[in-house]
Amino acid sequence: MFDVETLGVESTSVVLSASIIHFDSNDKVDYDQLLEKALFVKLDVDIQVKQYNRIIDKETLEWWDKQHNFVKRVSLKPSDDDLHPADAIRKLREYINSYGGDKTIWARGSLDQMSIDSLAVAVGEEKIVMYNMWRDVRTAVDLLCETAKDGYCEVVHPTFKRHNVIKHHPTHDCALDVMMLLYGK
């Protein structure tokens, strides 16, 4: 499962952060186990804007301003740990390769794929996976779950508590999407 947080809805928008979680549909994992398996990367915004002409959308900045302070700190506040975009792409690819390479990558719609692929090309890196490996969570949930509404559904798992999901934190968004695929009703 893959998720990015961005500063726009175009493929050339700044990528703030990304998370990826490997999962196997045969494994019966819980939400906390998914969080533990995640890779989270935060990217340097200034480098993306100044060196690669990535876009910052005013409306998206206004949207971020209305989000919870924790997720704003996680994704928006510059940190010494922010990665050069090329390093972030390499880390994501290394994570994927540690689980056997080109596997199916699930994401919530097409923006995640377009953004990370565009960024990889801009910084001269290989894309994290081939274009045909991407799958859409929303479509799967809408087709497979009787409680589906707008790409979300109820999750039936004894330890899962929806209120523990931190919306717009890419790791939590990934874990929720996996839970819906595995345990959606």
List where the protein language model places each region.
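A short, structured active-site edge motif that brings together acidic residues
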Residues: 39-45, 128-144
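Active-site-proximal helix-loop-helix substrate-binding element of RNase H-like nuclease domains
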Residues: 49-52, 61-65, 135-175
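Hydrophobic, well-ordered secondary-structure scaffolds
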Residues: 4-12, 160-162, 176
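Short glycine-aspartate micro-motif
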Residues: 1
